[in-house]
């Protein structure tokens, strides 16, 4: 299971939201490209970027920061936020981005996503952000009636790289992941899954390792790294060794 550090961009700065609320954001002083380089030096093998401004409005405004990040590191970059057209994807690929994440368009234009996954096999990631099991779109501002599980089943036949599944109610809380939700997703797809939302400790990471054999490819971590709950090097050292006896029991998972 890979640990993937996250950079959320707003007005060219690194920020973190609390439960996806744009009115509850925290700014971090380090420049985005400096943060990316720092994490690469810590041992990160990939960086996850979200353009929050574009996710909200559909208009990309952080491209300068994105390009600086790509030029500053020598590891793959995956990016999401407001990606709703072939033209935008080509533009991001021209910057050197490795994979793009499609969220809102996965619901609003499924045929486009199907076409793009064929045109760019294994370079399209489907981002599924859910609250109470139902998918949210437009930067988490619009709640749909579509179940996350239904969307995963539908897109599992496409040539996508992976699913990123985020439980909005845990995102930015540092209170642990929604393992019940993650388990449900893993049970219905053979596509690699990346979990996001809620990681606040090494114990949270260790607890997720029980899902590796079920298809959990990685976990995205943001706030915990920014607030020095642990470092990438610390987490990587632990995740790369057999620590099954250290995995805490999550009673909800076994319910």
From Swiss-Prot:
<dbReference type="GO" id="GO:0000162">
    <property type="term" value="P:L-tryptophan biosynthetic process"/>
</dbReference>
<comment type="similarity">
    <text>Belongs to the HisA/HisF family.</text>
</comment>
<comment type="pathway">
    <text>Amino-acid biosynthesis; L-histidine biosynthesis; L-histidine from 5-phospho-alpha-D-ribose 1-diphosphate: step 4/9.</text>
</comment>
<dbReference type="InterPro" id="IPR006063">
    <property type="entry name" value="HisA_bact_arch"/>
</dbReference>
<dbReference type="InterPro" id="IPR044524">
    <property type="entry name" value="Isoase_HisA-like"/>
</dbReference>
<protein>
    <recommendedName>
        <fullName>1-(5-phosphoribosyl)-5-[(5-phosphoribosylamino)methylideneamino] imidazole-4-carboxamide isomerase</fullName>
        <ecNumber>5.3.1.16</ecNumber>
    </recommendedName>
</protein>
<dbReference type="InterPro" id="IPR006062">
    <property type="entry name" value="His_biosynth"/>
</dbReference>
<feature type="active site" description="Proton acceptor">
    <location>
        <position position="8"/>
    </location>
</feature>
<dbReference type="GO" id="GO:0003949">
    <property type="term" value="F:1-(5-phosphoribosyl)-5-[(5-phosphoribosylamino)methylideneamino]imidazole-4-carboxamide isomerase activity"/>
</dbReference>
<dbReference type="InterPro" id="IPR013785">
    <property type="entry name" value="Aldolase_TIM"/>
</dbReference>
<dbReference type="GO" id="GO:0000105">
    <property type="term" value="P:L-histidine biosynthetic process"/>
</dbReference>
<dbReference type="GO" id="GO:0005737">
    <property type="term" value="C:cytoplasm"/>
</dbReference>
<dbReference type="InterPro" id="IPR011060">
    <property type="entry name" value="RibuloseP-bd_barrel"/>
</dbReference>
<keyword id="KW-0413">Isomerase</keyword>
<keyword id="KW-0963">Cytoplasm</keyword>
<keyword id="KW-0028">Amino-acid biosynthesis</keyword>
<dbReference type="Pfam" id="PF00977">
    <property type="entry name" value="His_biosynth"/>
</dbReference>
<feature type="active site" description="Proton donor">
    <location>
        <position position="129"/>
    </location>
</feature>
<dbReference type="InterPro" id="IPR023016">
    <property type="entry name" value="Isoase_HisA-like_bact"/>
</dbReference>
<keyword id="KW-0368">Histidine biosynthesis</keyword>
């Amino acid at each position: 299971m890979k640990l993937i550090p996250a950079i959320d961009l707003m007005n060219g700065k690194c920020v973190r939201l609390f439960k996806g609320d744009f009115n509850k954001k925290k700014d971090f002083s380090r420049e985005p490209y400096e943060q990316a380089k720092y994490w690469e030096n810590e041992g990160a093998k990939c960086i996850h970027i979200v353009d929050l401004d574009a996710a909200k409005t559909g208009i990309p405004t952080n491209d300068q920061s994105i390009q600086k990040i790509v030029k500053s590191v020598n590891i793959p970059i995956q990016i999401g936020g407001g990606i709703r057209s072939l033209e935008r994807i080509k533009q991001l690929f021209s910057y050197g981005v490795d994979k793009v994440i499609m969220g809102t368009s996965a619901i609003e234009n499924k045929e486009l996503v199907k076409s793009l996954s064929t045109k760019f096999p294994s370079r399209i990631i489907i981002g599924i952000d859910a609250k109470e099991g139902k998918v949210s779109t437009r930067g988490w501002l619009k709640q749909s009636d579509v179940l996350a599980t239904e969307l995963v089943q539908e897109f599992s036949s496409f040539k996508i790289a992976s699913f990123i599944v985020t439980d909005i109610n845990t995102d930015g809380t540092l209170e642990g992941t929604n393992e019940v939700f993650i388990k449900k997703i893993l049970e219905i797809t053979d596509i690699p899954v990346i979990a996001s939302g809620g990681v606040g400790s090494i114990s949270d990471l260790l607890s997720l390792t029980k899902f590796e054999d079920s298809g959990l490819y990685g976990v995205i971590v943001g706030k915990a790294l920014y607030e020095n709950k642990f470092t990438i090097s610390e987490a990587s050292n632990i995740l790369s060794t057999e620590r099954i006896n250290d995995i805490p029991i999550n009673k909800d998972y076994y319910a």
